Amino acid sequence: MLTPEAQRAARGLLGWGVRELGAAAGVAWTTVSQFENGRPLRQSTAAKIMAAFADQGVELVTDEDRTGAVLVYARRKGA
């Protein structure tokens, strides 16, 4: 599940700002920013954002005790 906290953590792992995430996910950067500030996302938008993270080797972690992101593998630059 995508949460604002997990999204921020994943962006941090990748060194991405909201504009970079928006471009990678094919959504407006303002949508990314608004979500992190409490506005809900459509399911389809959340799926695009999660796919962009997965493409970079980042998995989101959300359970009862923790929220964040882990880097499962790193893509080589230019790959």
Regions found by a protein language model. Name each.
Residues 58-79:
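Helix-turn-helix/homeodomain-like alpha-helical modules used for DNA recognition
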Residues 26, 43-61:
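DNA major-groove recognition helix of helix-turn-helix/homeodomain DNA-binding modules
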Residues 26-41:
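Recognition helix of helix-turn-helix/homeodomain-like DNA-binding domains
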Residues 9, 23, 34, 51:
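DNA-binding alpha-helical recognition surfaces that contact promoter or target DNA
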Residues 5-20:
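Short basic helix-loop element that most often maps to the first helix and adjoining turn
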Residues 20, 31, 45:
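Residues in the helix-turn-helix
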